[in-house]
Amino acid sequence: RRVLFRSNESYFMFRNEFCEQEIYLIENKISCAAPAFILCSADIHLHRKARLCRLSRMGALSQGRMLRVMRIKITIELSEKRFPADYRRAFLHLMKNALSTYMNGIYFQDFFPEGRPQRKEYAFAVGLPQGSACRGEYFDLGKNGIVATLTTGNPTYYILLYNAFRRLKGKQQLFMKGVSGRVASVRPASQPPVQNDKILVDFMSPLCVREHVDRKDRYFSVEEPDFYEQVRRVVSYQLTEKDWITDGMLEGFRIYPHQMGKTVARFYTEQLECSLGSAVLCGEPRLLQELYDNGIGSRCSAGFGVFRILTT
């Protein structure tokens, strides 16, 4: 089956109460103002207890409460209580495997295009168990599992990523010498939409702020005196292609570290100076929602800039 692309404002999603199933986009004629698509599992019509949740750009209406379903929780079971120290690279490898095998890899280039680097509409965070300790080339986890969170504001990307990782469930993947693992579960995660102009957030993956000058990269942590201006510069750059963003929105954005400190993140051969902890983000709700959906800062698609909302 091929995935059809959504072209209207709203779409629908069936949820199955009995088991997780793959989500497909299929065209369907329904009574509404514009042609719509339906997201449904392959054999959802076989079950009577399927529930219908209406989705829109703002989210899903479930039992009278508006929710967004644009994040995916991926649980990975490991053969050993270890994981590579460069765990962002390890998860990227897993993601590439998922996309290269799903639908014969026809959507791989959408997520990993060749040529000049470009901004991507997704981000992820890899969560190691509390108490994990770095032992050189690997982390001692204390448990034989990790949980990764994928987020995107692009509904099509969400469906493709969900389906790709679902297809990978149960298949062994080699992460490092002596350590393999498998995707144990793939589940959607919901969050109320941002409705206020001030939110307290906790970063699930480090906030990376990069400045590229004369073919050299410089990274800014919260300890740098111009950290605030650098964050605003990067946010302006990452949102510049959004036609609904105004200069006033960008000028009104602010970040106020709450309990945030400097951290050094390993990524391939680099040691990147970043920031981790909690902060208050201020700005137009739609702008804050965009940052929540696709990450904030530099290198979001490489495992940086994902946050959870603590209070709105």
Give the label of every model feature segment.
Residues 11, 16, 24, 28, ...:
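Intrinsic-disorder-associated, low-complexity terminal segments enriched in Asp/Asn/His/Tyr and depleted
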